[in-house]
Structures are given as structure tokens and as C-alpha cells.
Regions:
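Extended polysaccharide-engagement surfaces of secreted carbohydrate-active enzymes
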Residues: 3-341
């Protein structure tokens, strides 16, 4: 649930939209609680928790400085003692973990963490409540997360990202809406369960596969549709997770109503402030369209967000902000993609 001291965003529900409650903030709260609970752990529990806790504290350089309140004095002292304890080796082990009761999968390695958030007949597409996370309609639509040295999801990522183009998702980019405000004065709508049960996965040791059937048909509430989306959209997505490779597959993706085309989003990453990240396609650095729009303009579809079209794409690579970046391989010879900044 934590990577380098940050709580995973796929586990945060609607709180991802709170700019003052980032994954770093929640991660620090979790670390503080972990320090408090150390005395209640048995020997086996301490052997498991101490190495991970030590690495989280080492990776979050601002954790100790954030402990400023009177009630944090003891926590800070214990954290310092843990850092100086040479008998504890900082280590977060590789793991492949399925969470079937919330349709999540986490694939953790030393230098990265990959996660997928899905939805089904059991789990909703997102959490929208009390006017929070109003545009989070596709956050569980097979969204893929890559955590590495770039800290992608901090610094108000969720309130600035294109809500129709979240990494790994296959969607019809339409404004689903949030319904009318209730007696509280806040909107509560836009989240729903699908009618699909083929959602889940399995694993062998530290490797695994997951799959998700999806469609625009949603479950009804009190006999009425929860939301008007794209009833003709359907398909299946699968993810095969190995050591350094993640294989992402899509099959049977169709939508009879093509007024607004279906989009599959390969990646959507936050760049450096100057946008200087190198992007390569088949070994060349092409010119790519620069698009500017705020989230409200994106939701209204009032701005042209089409990208530069590339054909016969075999591979691509995007340089990271701090990391070496991520490579993408396309096995089919006729692959065509669109790219914009």
C-alpha cells in the first residue's frame, strides 16, 4: 500500500482530489501509526515491518522534519533510533498482491511499483461524494499506475490531469456528469458498478495476471440507470506482470455508436516544468503537438486535444523527470498512435 513513503493513489478513493491531502501526506500518517504500533508487534511482525518502515523513512527525506507537533516528539525519537539501528537492514521485498474485494492488484519491485485499479459488478468505477472527485469517472477503468523516482501522482496531479485520458484506460470520452445536488447542496453522482463479473486475477509467487471485462452498461439503482454512459461499449483487458516487463492486452473492444471514438490511453505522465523530457519513437525524436487546456475545458470538450499521428510504431520511450523513464513495445507491425504534450 506504500511506495517510498507515499500511499498508493488507487487506494485513496475520492481523497485523491484533495490538494492538501496528497499521497505523501497520507503515507506519513501511515508511517507515524506504524512507529506507534511497533511495541505491540511480536518478533515475526517486527522482522517484517522494521525493514520496510526503515526504507520508507529513508526514502521520504522530509518525514522527520514533518514531525513538528508535541505528540510527534516520541515518534521522531523512535524513527531516528530505527534509522541508526545497524541491525535492521532497510528493505521492501518484491511482491505480487491481489485485492479481490476491491478489484486492485499491486506488483512491487525494488525500483518500481505497478498497480491496476478495476471495477466490476461488485466495485464502483470511482468514488464521487460531497462535490469531491467530480471528474474521476474512469479512475477504476483499468487505470495503470507506475510508481518510480518521478513521484508522478504528487503536486496536484489529479486536479490537472485529463480525466478522459488516464493511463491504461479504454473509454468513450464523454461527460458522464454528477447529477443534481442533493439536500446537502453537493453533487453525489457519477459513480456506478458495471454488469461484469469477469474481473480479477491470479498469481504464482511474485508474478501474476489480471483481467477485466468492461462495458458501458451499468447497474441500475431503484429501477433507474445510475448514469447515461456508452451502452454499446464493451471489451476485455488483461495485464501480465513479470520482473521488468508488463504486458497489456486488449481484445474485443467495440462500440457501435462511433460519434465519439473509443480511446485506449497508453500513458499520461506529468513532465518536467519545461517539458524537456525526451520522447522517442522507433529511435527518433519527433515533433509533437503541444495542447493547453484546464480540466473544465477538457470536460466540456471545448478544446482540440488531438495528437500528432504516427504510423508503423514498433517502440517508444519517454524520459522520466528523475528516473530513466519507461519504454513501450508494440508487437503488431501496423500500430498507429497519437501523441500530444
Amino acid at each position: 500500500a506504500i511506495y517510498k513513503g507515499c500511499m498508493l493513489d488507487c487506494l485513496k478513493g475520492r481523497s485523491v482530489s484533495r490538494p492538501t491531502w496528497s499521497n505523501r501526506d497520507i503515507g506519513r500518517e501511515a508511517m507515524k501509526i506504524s512507529v506507534r504500533l511497533l511495541d505491540f508487534l511480536g518478533e515475526n511482525g517486527r522482522k517484517t515491518v522494521l525493514p520496510m518502515l526503515k526504507e520508507w523513512i529513508e526514502e521520504d527525506k522530509g518525514f522527520l522534519d514533518s514531525l513538528k507537533n508535541v505528540e510527534d516528539i516520541d515518534i521522531k525519537d523512535r524513527a531516528k533510533k530505527l534509522l541508526s539501528d545497524t541491525s535492521v537492514r532497510s528493505e521492501v521485498p518484491s511482491v505480487h498482491k491481489l485485492y479481490p474485494l476491491m478489484d486492485r492488484v499491486i506488483h512491487r519491485r525494488k525500483k518500481y511499483l505497478f498497480a491496476v485499479s478495476m471495477y466490476s459488478e461488485r466495485i464502483q468505477n470511482t468514488e464521487i461524494m460531497n462535490h469531491e472527485n467530480r471528474f474521476g469517472w474512469h479512475q477504476n477503468n483499468g487505470m495503470t499506475y507506475i510508481y518510480d523516482a518521478d513521484n508522478q501522482y504528487t503536486e496536484n496531479y489529479w486536479n490537472t490531469v485529463n480525466p478522459f485520458r488516464l493511463s491504461g484506460t479504454t473509454v468513450v470520452p464523454v461527460n458522464i456528469g454528477n447529477g443534481k445536488p442533493d439536500s446537502s447542496g453537493y453533487v453525489q453522482g457519477g459513480d456506478f458498478c458495471s454488469k461484469e463479473s469477469w474481473v480479477g486475477g491470479t498469481g504464482i509467487e511474485n508474478f501474476g495476471i489480471s483481467g477485466m471485462a468492461f462495458s458501458g452498461k451499468v447497474q441500475t439503482v431503484s429501477g433507474d440507470p445510475a448514469v447515461s454512459y456508452a451502452p454499446d461499449l464493451k471489451g476485455k483487458k488483461s495485464w501480465f506482470m513479470f520482473e521488468k516487463e508488463i504486458v497489456c492486452l486488449g481484445a474485443g473492444i467495440t462500440n457501435k455508436n462511433m460519434e465519439i471514438p473509443v480511446e485506449t490511453i497508453i500513458e499520461n505522465k506529468k513532465l518536467r516544468k519545461d517539458g524537456s523530457n525526451q520522447f522517442l519513437i522507433n529511435g527518433e525524436s519527433p515533433d509533437v503537438l503541444l495542447r493547453k487546456a484546464d480540466v473544465k475545458e477538457l470536460v466540456k470538450r471545448s478544446k482540440d486535444m488531438s495528437g500528432t499521428r504516427f504510423e508503423q510504431v514498433h517502440w517508444a520511450h519517454l524520459e522520466g523527470n528523475r528516473s530513466v523513464g519507461t519504454g513501450y513495445y508494440f508487437p503488431e507491425e501496423n500500430t498507429e498512435i497519437q501523441v500530444c504534450r
